[in-house]
């Protein structure tokens, strides 16, 4: 599930007791990473998509405050860039899976960004684009730098960090893509 900021805001209003008992606000893959490594973390794309600043590749104190989640800020895990950092598979999980303890585990970026990377969206020096059609339709273009990011007057879409420092993807989504085929 994405959009953690608004989800936490809803929980603050309708399920405050659950939010008060919470230790960390994980995305699904972040919870898996925690169970594999014992490290509470999220990646730059999840932090930006939740309530972050794409320029900083991290959560934004200003956005968290605007959402009214200052008291819940500690629930957001630290941001770890899986292109640079890994953590070892825990001894217990290794034993349960029949794997060697300490194998590096990498925290991946959001699926849509990884799909765009695989489709060839990353092409420095070119204004490339791609569309991903699944349950959601993502229409994306690549930006070589923060200076190339152009926010539109309608304030639609969003900007995600790419798994290469200083690069971005601007995105518009259609939340029912394959239903329209």
Where do the PLM segments sit?
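Gly/Ser/Thr-rich active-site cleft segment
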Residues: 1-110
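Catalytic phosphate/nucleotide-handling subdomain of diverse soluble enzymes
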Residues: 95, 108-181
């Amino acid at each position: 599930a994405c959009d953690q900021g608004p989800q936490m805001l809803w929980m603050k209003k309708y399920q405050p007791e659950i939010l008060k008992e919470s230790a960390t606000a994980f995305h699904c893959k972040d919870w898996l990473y925690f169970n594999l490594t014992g490290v509470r973390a999220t990646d730059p794309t999840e932090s930006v998509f939740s309530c972050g600043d794409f320029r900083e590749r991290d959560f934004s104190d200003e956005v968290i405050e605007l959402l009214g989640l200052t008291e819940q800020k500690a629930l957001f895990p630290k941001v770890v860039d899986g292109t640079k950092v890994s953590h070892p598979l825990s001894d217990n999980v290794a034993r349960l899976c029949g794997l060697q303890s300490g194998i590096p585990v990498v925290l991946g970026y959001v699926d849509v960004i990884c799909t765009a990377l695989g489709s060839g969206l990353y092409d420095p020096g070119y204004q490339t684009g791609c569309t991903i059609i699944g349950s959601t339709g993502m229409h994306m273009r690549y930006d070589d730098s923060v200076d190339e990011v152009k926010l539109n007057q309608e304030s639609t879409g969003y900007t995600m960090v790419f798994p290469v420092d200083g690069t971005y993807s601007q995105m518009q989504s259609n939340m029912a893509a394959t239903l329209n085929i």
